[in-house]
Amino acid sequence: MVQSKIEIFTAMLAEQPENAMIWYGLASEQYKLENWAEAAKSLRQVVSLNPDYTAAYQMLGTVLANAGDLAGAQQAWRDGIEAADRTGAWKAKQHLHALLESAAGADEALRPD
C-alpha cells in the first residue's frame, strides 16, 4: 500500500507533535491540494510552536488570501514581518512586505468608489 504524503506527515506527528517542521511539511501538502482550512490550521500550529518561522507566516497569509480572508492574510504577513525583525531575516522581511503591499493594492482596487 502506498501512503500519501499527508498520511506520512500525520503518522510522524503522532510521534512528534511538537515538531514545527513536520507541521510545515503537512501544511505544504495540504496547500498543494488547495485544502485551505486544513493548511491554515497546520500553519497556525507551526507558528505557535515556533513564532520565528517566517516561511510559515508567508504561507499562512497566502493560504488565507486564497480562502478569501484578505484581512487575515495581511495580519499573518505583518506577524511574519515582526518575526523577521526579531530574527534578522531581511530577505523574508522584504518578501513579506511585498506581499502585504500587493494585498493592500488588491484590497483598495476592490473597494467601491
Enumerate the language-model features and the residues they cover:
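Canonical positions in the second alpha-helix
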Residues: A11-M12, Q45-V46, G80
